[in-house]
Amino acid sequence: MAEMRPGPVVGKQLNEQPDHSPLVQPGLAELRRRAQEEGVPETPQPLTDAFLLRFLRARDFDLDLAWRLMKNYYKWRAECPELSADLHPRSILGLLKAGYHGVLRSRDPTGSRVLIYRISYWDPKVFTAYDVFRVSLITSELIVQEVETQRNGVKAIFDLEGWQISHAFQITPSVAKKIAAVVTDSFPLKVRGIHLINEPVIFHAVFSMIKPFLTEKIKGRIHLHGNNYKSSLLQHFPDILPLEYGGNESSMEDICQEWTNFIMKSEDYLSSISETIQ
């Protein structure tokens, strides 16, 4: 009988390998070669193994897809300096202190990080859509350093209670396109789910503006829970939701404060990657 030999380690199997594994080296070497050949800038972030692995893991080690994602990341940053060149958290500290955003302490059953955004804590007279988007980008740049998050991605909960016309006016077609670009194929994080709760009728006009820019895969991961959301939301996130959303975890106030503290402790790192890419 012929000896059974294991097949090559590919895709999701490679995703489970640690950064220093010899099995990931060929992919790293090829992605680095392409980046250097194309003249990808080594500032503000050098082409270290850890940095390159973000793109490889985000696309399950498909080199062509990882390379496309990497090019899109640099293209987006070059085209949106108003966001990418200003990741200093003090510019959005008021929004954070208001309780707009937090990251849950525990991951969901699939290992995804879970982010919560609360629209009622965004005062559109004080903060623009770009400020709100910057909060998300800052969090993304911090959690993408986590290997488990690179492997298992993120899920976001948007509590749209309090959404008003003044919020809607902030989301222009240009802003909608930039948001969609990051969600789909311009940032090295797997978006595993987008959950909307308390969505009012007037929000659907904005949603219709963003939707054409999204891929079919992302569209299929959007869940509209409405006002009676607690039972359906708990099915997706059992045991990890804060008290306000039907769970047994801490209050949103505590969760938001903890994440704000973490962002402020990361100020030096965020400043170091705040740079306009030519």
UniProtKB/Swiss-Prot annotation:
It comes from Rattus norvegicus (Rat). (+)-alpha-tocopherol binds at F187. This is Alpha-tocopherol transfer protein. InterPro entries: CRAL-TRIO_dom, CRAL-TRIO_dom_sf, CRAL/TRIO_N_dom, CRAL/TRIO_N_dom_sf. It holds the Pfam family CRAL_TRIO_N. Liver. Binds alpha-tocopherol, enhances its transfer between separate membranes, and stimulates its release from liver cells. Binds both phosphatidylinositol 3,4-bisphosphate and phosphatidylinositolphosphatidylinol 4,5-bisphosphate; the resulting conformation change is important for the release of the bound alpha-tocopherol. A 1,2-diacyl-sn-glycero-3-phospho-(1D-myo-inositol-3,4-bisphosphate) binds at D185, K190, V191, R192, K217, R221. Coiled coil: none annotated. Residues 88-253 form the CRAL-TRIO domain. Monomer and homotetramer. Phosphatidylinositol 4,5-bisphosphate binding induces the formation of homotetramers. Phosphatidylinositol 3,4-bisphosphate is less efficient in inducing tetramerization. A 1,2-diacyl-sn-glycero-3-phospho-(1D-myo-inositol-4,5-bisphosphate) binds at S208, M209, I210, K211. Keywords: Cytoplasm, Lipid-binding, Transport.
